[in-house]
Amino acid sequence: MDPSTLFLLLIIAAGIILLAVFFTFVPVMLWISALAAGVKISIFTLIGMRLRRVIPNRVVNPLIKAHKAGLDVAINQLESHYLAGGNVDRVVNALIAAQRANIELTFARCAAIDLAGRDVLEAVQMSVNPKVIETPFIAGVAMDGIEVKAKARITVRANIDRLVGGAGEETIIARVGEGIVSTIGSSDNHKKVLENPDMISQTVLSKGLDSGTAFEILSIDIADVDIGKNIGAILQTDQAEADKNIAQAKAEERRAMAVAQEQEMRARVEEMRAKVVEAEAEVPLAMSEALRSGKIGVMDYLNMKNIDADTDMRDSFGKMTKDQNEEDHK
């Protein structure tokens, strides 16, 4: 092969490689699209984005959209927001929606809301079209002891000025639930709540529950009211059961004390019987001593034995008569 021809082929291959690298590194088509949309961007600006590891279409496409919407947004603002980790496309969409709805919203404010983790586009849309938050059934107990369950629908509008640092929907639901419980608990009778559920919404709405939140409460409507358990009767039943258990425990304690006292008295009876037996055992000794010392004679002793025998005989007769009478009664 001719050396000149080989050199020419090498130059052509090198040119093709350089063009491929150029079109890969430099988004020429994106640059042409921006120029066609009337957005003036230097090709070196796009190259600088590549060097700063910024995806050019993530910045240029929102810039074209903002330019077509008539927004005064610089490419440096969009690039800095992208580098900060924000969603450039969502911020531009929020600015366009705010402009169409005549809501004052600057790029700096919108970017701050986006970096705070809030969906700024949803917030703008919610400012135009309020959102309805439905609470679960919230139970409260009226003064007559009847449980009343209420479900509320809260219509809120986003407050863009308080999106950064303001509380969310959970706080709104918790505060409304607290107001419902307080209103039901202050009612003398559960029938008043059933007859006039607007009393709950009016009382709750007058407390300014949206302070410190990212929302403005427009209305609170009671969607459903239901009757729950008779808490007062349940508490009284539980108290009566507890009183019964206490009384049973005290009665058992008294019974145990009575049994213990009975056992103690039986022990004392046995002790007295032992003393009687001991005393009876000393009688023969005393009799023998009296006979030995001559204090009583033999005839006196025999008379005493006869008297004892007569006494035992009368006792046996009495027992026989008593047993016979009991059998006759049976």
Curated annotation (Swiss-Prot):
Keywords: Cell membrane, Membrane, Transmembrane, Transmembrane helix
Transmembrane segments: 6-26, 28-48
Membrane topology annotation: Multi-pass membrane protein
Compartments in which it is found: Cell membrane; Membrane raft
Any one GO cellular component localisation term in the record: membrane raft
HAMAP family in the record: FloA
Purpose: Found in functional membrane microdomains (FMM) that may be equivalent to eukaryotic membrane rafts. FMMs are highly dynamic and increase in number as cells age. Flotillins are thought to be important factors in membrane fluidity.
Protein name: Flotillin-like protein FloA
Native source organism of the sequence: Bacillus licheniformis (strain ATCC 14580 / DSM 13 / JCM 2505 / CCUG 7422 / NBRC 12200 / NCIMB 9375 / NCTC 10341 / NRRL NRS-1264 / Gibson 46)
Gene encoding the protein: floA
